[in-house]
């Protein structure tokens, strides 16, 4: 099936009388309830469940191997190739399936808040609640923008269409397939809404570097003087918590582009984790979950319809989707100048990385490529040994190009704009998990505040003997002895052993970057 035929078939589908275009939030909420797709919470949010897929399915994600992408994509476990023939057949089947539906829902909008670089997208949904989700998550067009809107990428999402691996060339019933030549994302077999969000992020991660823009998996905020800070970090390291600051306005919580004009949010909404959410801990997120927000896999009280955010029965990965405008303290539109500070967040359960350290450009590139954090492997089964995880550029699952391309762009931009970079450990202190304790949030906030406000620019530093990092000897609001990890351990020998163990894990992980400039590891990596 050629591209022209595909376009014709899609046009035919979208002209059907039962296809709803650009419904408002209120109309979509009505549809969700009429169609029995979800329930209304006491604040007017829509609560839905996603069946057996309560998170992304990275093993079911493919990119179509086409002449234009054959040489530019980093093929492998993250970016699995699929032939154009396999994709075309499956695309045809999904469209035939959607032709038979009673109702479909279409949203047109944008990815990218900077009008110069935004991507006009359209999303075709089988479910009304999915359409509500994309309405809240992507950038909503004005009436004038909608009239002139010509989609450059289409997401087709048919969760109840199940692939047959024997016939369809997939691994399972679920599939998330990106075709850059056909400018299409095809999703089926999974109801998890995050697939739509992250597939467009993957698309932007491929397209933006062609325009000299660095796409980033980070949160961003801006101070009263217009100073921009970026926060990189994997899940659970505190990106959302630390970038939500009453004294700074939020640009975005997850996906950004860095152009020669500055920073812009790729999205128009937030997709916040809400396990154990409380108004005391995260008032901005708690209060944003109002009318038209989407709650994914959150358990409700049957009578009062009040969400129980502490209930992880369905999944620990409970989520809330809401528009940025539901947060009071934001930059609107979500664009700002060049960053003056970058913070890499890691949750080190080995308890050996310093709570804050200043990075050189080479160290910044090294730690960006490493993308280190740790997770507590199987604590529920009594296994308490932490596991080191490395996710390149703090976003490996969403990077179609080789990691080095993103790291080199970051290195150039850090040098060009004289950006200060810090590594902040929000994990353990005084020993590894099980012995030490989690770093106090108040201390981490004080360190981040000092870093972002330039208070550490001229501070005296001590070099970490194992990781080579420059540790400030004093940070306002933080006891000095907390800053040096070895001082917090009772057993100094055990500290050294554990630190060397982690340093070796960094080295072993970095072997996969054998083809890059060796000075990055030489000047940026551990000393041992």
Swiss-Prot record:
Sequence positions that bind ATP: 198, 217, 233-241, 282, 319, 444
Which positions are annotated as binding substrate? 56, 192, 198, 319
- Pfam families for this protein: PEPCK_ATP
Could you tell me the Gene Ontology terms of the biological process aspect for this record?
A: gluconeogenesis
The cofactor binding remark recorded in the entry reads: Binds 1 Mn(2+) ion per subunit.
Q: What does this protein do?
A: Involved in the gluconeogenesis. Catalyzes the conversion of oxaloacetate (OAA) to phosphoenolpyruvate (PEP) through direct phosphoryl transfer between the nucleoside triphosphate and OAA.
The similarity annotation says:
Belongs to the phosphoenolpyruvate carboxykinase (ATP) family.
Q: Which NCBIfam families match?
A: pckA (TIGR00224), PRK09344.1-2 (NF006820), PRK09344.1-3 (NF006821)
Instruction: Give the protein's recorded name.
Output: Phosphoenolpyruvate carboxykinase (ATP)
Q: Report the source organism.
A: Geobacillus kaustophilus (strain HTA426)
What phylogenetic lineage does the species belong to? Bacteria, Bacillati, Bacillota, Bacilli, Bacillales
